[in-house]
């Protein structure tokens, strides 16, 4: 009985020790393939799992240099006045990769106040990791329907199928002609 009481007291103390806002942040790529010259969609999700509102929340992502990525829509630096407890916010950015190759998608920085007069808390989002950005030509070669290739294949296989068919048909016609009956 004493053990149960001490465990409950410890859990109660831990739950009251972590009062204030606590943010969990994730960064994810929504595209299956990153392709040079095509839109790349990033989504940031921030969850407040704490007991009070997070104040002056700022999301900053400096991992996309302007010489490698163009911003199509959205912003890489965003501010929210407050995020209520047990709620979340999402932010989406659409980028356009300008160069093909491997790129390390690192985490973004999240800063906020856990309590009104408390210190600034610095956190990081999850990092998608290293990924390849395909060249437009390579992407088209891999994933296009190849209609022209299939048409050329069909034209090239016609002689190998058509010549034996014509020989068979002429032989069949020669030997299958009904003979006229003599009376």
Curated annotation (Swiss-Prot):
TM ranges: 150-169
Residue ranges, Lumenal side: 18-149
Function, in words: TRAP proteins are part of a complex whose function is to bind calcium to the ER membrane and thereby regulate the retention of ER resident proteins.
Positions bearing carbohydrate: 88, 104
Membrane topology: Single-pass type I membrane protein
Name of the molecule in the record: Translocon-associated protein subunit beta
Main location group: endoplasmic reticulum
Location of this chain's protein in the cell: Endoplasmic reticulum membrane
Domain of life: Eukaryota
Subunit composition and interactions: Heterotetramer of TRAP-alpha, TRAP-beta, TRAP-delta and TRAP-gamma. Interacts with STING1.
Family (UniProt): Belongs to the TRAP-beta family.
Single GO cellular component term: endoplasmic reticulum membrane
InterPro entries associated with the record: TRAP_beta
Keyword vocabulary terms for this entry: Endoplasmic reticulum, Glycoprotein, Membrane, Signal, Transmembrane, Transmembrane helix
Biological processes annotated in GO: in utero embryonic development
Gene symbol of the encoding locus: SSR2
Residues exposed to the Cytoplasmic side: 170-183
Signal sequence residues: 1-17
